[in-house]
Structure formats: structure tokens, C-alpha cells
């Protein structure tokens, strides 16, 4: 088979990316700084059948995107994201599931590298370090407060060693190696493209429970505001009905006018002892349940003690 020319390879890449763009509407935009070929192969294997990863030169990616603007106009929003060491993950399955698979393939087997941009803040906790006093001057040069306790260096307070977005310095990398603290390297999912909508990948961390909780709080706030201002809304309907019923009861409790639910309330007001007598057996039964369970436990414990004594006598 003849070797493909540079132009042929470029054309094949553009055709492949064009095909994927038209086929998939959900894309994860990823960055692969400090990711080795073996680790990348592991990610591809884990995503097989669920998603397709495509890396490439940024110029080729832009060329392919621009060629498909007429067929898929919404992909124009991807153009500003084509920068640095990035690529696309074209997703068939749920985006959150794909992202979790990618995160599971992170590796922490390599020490921190000089000049690498820190993706997160790095803190050193206070406490014993296991380092001998000869390292005191090195730690003090980094502005770390220490003291010697039982022949080893102890850090006095939390140390913000590296800030997110900053480059790892030689001193910071050396200190992390001394503490045997290795950073996690892996494919970094940064942005989501969902059928023309672009949003931060952190949105995928939001669960259905989080949404329901926020919605419930919002409804409660609307209901409280509606009650305070006297403006009736759907959120305040339950409260309005309860208040209206209370007003009706207060108005007709001493009159001859009644309705089915009011009859029950009037009977309760006229003869509260009768309702108390009905409620008493039920409450008494509930109160007796813990006592019965406790008595049963005592009996079981006594039986166990007897059995244990008999067993001891047999083998003594």
C-alpha cells in the first residue's frame, strides 16, 4: 500500500471530523495536557461503543468546522474553543456517564512536573512530615512555618502551595516529591456542546435531586412572597385554602350552618372526650410496642446466657 501524502492525510482527517460533526449532536471538549499515549489508549478503550475521541491539529479542526457551517450552523460556537492541546469526544450515551468514565482513567503515578499549569489548588496540611530537621531551611524558604517535634519537622498550619492556573515551580515540585504527593494527570473535560448549546462541564455535576431541591426552595420563596403581599399565585394556593378554611370554621362554628367536614369538627368540639377515648387505645398500643420489644430482648439475652453456661460446662 502506497504511503499517504500529507495532503491526503489532511483530507482524510477533515472528512472524518465532518462525518462525526454531522452524526453527533453531543460533544465534550477536552484538553490533554500531560497525558501519555498509553493513558490515552486506555481512555479510548473504556469509551469503546459509547463515544469516539478525535484529536488533531487546531488548524485542521478549524478548517473542518468551517466547511460544515452551512450543513450544521450551530457548530460555529465551537470555533472559539479550538485552542491549546484540545480534542473532541463525540458521545452516544449520557454525557455525565461519559465524563465519569474519562475521570476514572486519571493517573497519579508520576510526580509533579516543573512548568506544568496546575488545574487545581494544592494544599499541604499541618502536622508531622516525617522529615528530619535538616530540611527546615528548605521549608522556610517556601514560607512554611515549622517546628521540630520528637526529632521530625512538623508543619504548623495549612499551606497553599500552588494556586490553580499557576505554573509549578521547581521548589513546589521538589516539595511534593519529598511528601510523595503525586498529581493526577488525565483527559480534562472542560466544556460541553449539546445540540448548539455551550456550557461548562461542571454543570454535569448537578443531579436531579439538586434541581428538585432548588425548585422546592424557589416555590417556597414565591409562596412566602405571595402571602406577604396578598397576591395569590399557584405556589400560595395551599396556604390560601387553609387560611380560608380556618376563617370559615371560625365564622360558622357557633351557627347552625354546616357542611360534611364541619359536622365532624362540631362533634369534636361538642364531645372531645369521645375522640380522646378513640385515640387513647391507639397511642397506648404504640407506647407498649417498645416495652414489648425490650422484654423480648431481655428474654433472648437470658436464653443466650443459659446456653453459654451449658456449653462451658460441657467442655470444661
UniProtKB/Swiss-Prot annotation:
Keywords: Phosphoprotein, Ribonucleoprotein, Ribosomal protein. InterPro entries: Ribosomal_protein_uL10, Ribosomal_uL10, Ribosomal_uL10-like_insert, Ribosomal_uL10-like_insert_sf, Ribosomal_uL10-like_sf, uL10_eukaryotes. The keyword NADP does not apply. GO terms for molecular function: large ribosomal subunit rRNA binding; structural constituent of ribosome. The keyword Zinc does not apply. GO terms for cellular component: cytosolic large ribosomal subunit. GO terms for biological process: cytoplasmic translation; ribosomal large subunit assembly. It holds the Pfam family Ribosomal_60s. Residues 286-299 have a biased composition (Basic and acidic residues). Residues 282-316 are annotated as: Disordered. Phosphorylated. Ribosomal protein P0 is the functional equivalent of E.coli protein L10. P0 forms a pentameric complex by interaction with dimers of P1 and P2. Belongs to the universal ribosomal protein uL10 family. This is Large ribosomal subunit protein uL10. It comes from Plasmodium falciparum (isolate 7G8). The gene is RPLP0.
Amino acid at each position: 500500500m502506497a504511503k499517504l501524502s500529507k495532503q491526503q492525510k489532511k483530507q482524510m482527517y477533515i472528512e472524518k471530523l465532518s462525518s462525526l460533526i454531522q452524526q453527533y449532536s453531543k460533544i465534550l471538549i477536552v484538553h490533554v495536557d500531560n497525558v501519555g499515549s498509553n493513558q490515552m489508549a486506555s481512555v479510548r478503550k473504556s469509551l469503546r461503543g459509547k463515544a469516539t475521541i478525535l484529536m488533531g491539529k487546531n488548524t485542521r479542526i478549524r478548517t473542518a468546522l468551517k466547511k460544515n457551517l452551512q450543513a450544521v450552523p450551530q457548530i460555529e460556537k465551537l470555533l472559539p474553543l479550538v485552542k491549546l492541546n484540545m480534542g473532541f469526544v463525540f458521545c452516544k450515551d449520557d454525557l455525565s456517564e461519559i465524563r465519569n468514565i474519562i475521570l476514572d482513567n486519571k493517573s497519579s503515578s508520576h510526580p509533579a512536573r516543573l512548568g506544568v499549569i496546575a488545574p487545581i489548588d494544592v494544599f499541604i496540611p499541618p502536622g508531622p512530615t516525617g522529615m528530619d530537621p535538616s530540611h527546615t531551611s528548605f521549608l522556610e524558604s517556601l514560607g512554611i512555618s515549622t517546628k521540630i517535634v520528637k526529632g521530625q519537622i512538623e508543619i504548623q498550619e495549612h499551606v497553599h502551595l500552588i494556586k490553580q492556573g499557576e505554573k509549578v515551580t521547581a521548589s513546589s515540585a521538589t516539595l511534593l516529591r519529598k511528601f510523595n504527593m503525586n498529581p493526577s494527570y488525565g483527559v480534562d473535560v472542560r466544556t460541553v456542546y449539546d445540540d448548539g448549546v455551550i456550557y461548562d462541564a461542571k454543570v454535569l455535576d448537578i443531579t436531579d435531586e439538586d434541581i428538585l431541591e432548588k425548585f422546592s426552595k424557589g416555590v417556597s420563596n414565591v409562596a412566602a412572597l405571595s402571602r406577604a403581599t396578598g397576591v395569590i399565585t399557584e405556589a400560595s394556593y395551599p396556604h390560601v385554602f387553609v387560611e380560608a378554611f380556618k376563617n370559615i370554621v371560625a365564622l360558622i362554628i357557633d351557627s347552625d350552618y354546616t357542611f360534611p367536614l364541619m359536622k365532624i369538627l362540631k362533634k369534636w368540639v361538642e364531645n372531645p372526650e369521645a375522640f380522646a377515648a378513640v385515640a387513647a387505645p391507639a397511642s397506648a398500643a404504640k407506647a407498649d410496642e417498645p416495652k414489648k420489644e425490650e422484654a423480648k430482648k431481655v428474654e433472648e439475652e437470658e436464653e443466650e446466657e443459659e446456653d453459654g453456661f451449658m456449653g462451658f460446662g460441657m467442655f470444661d
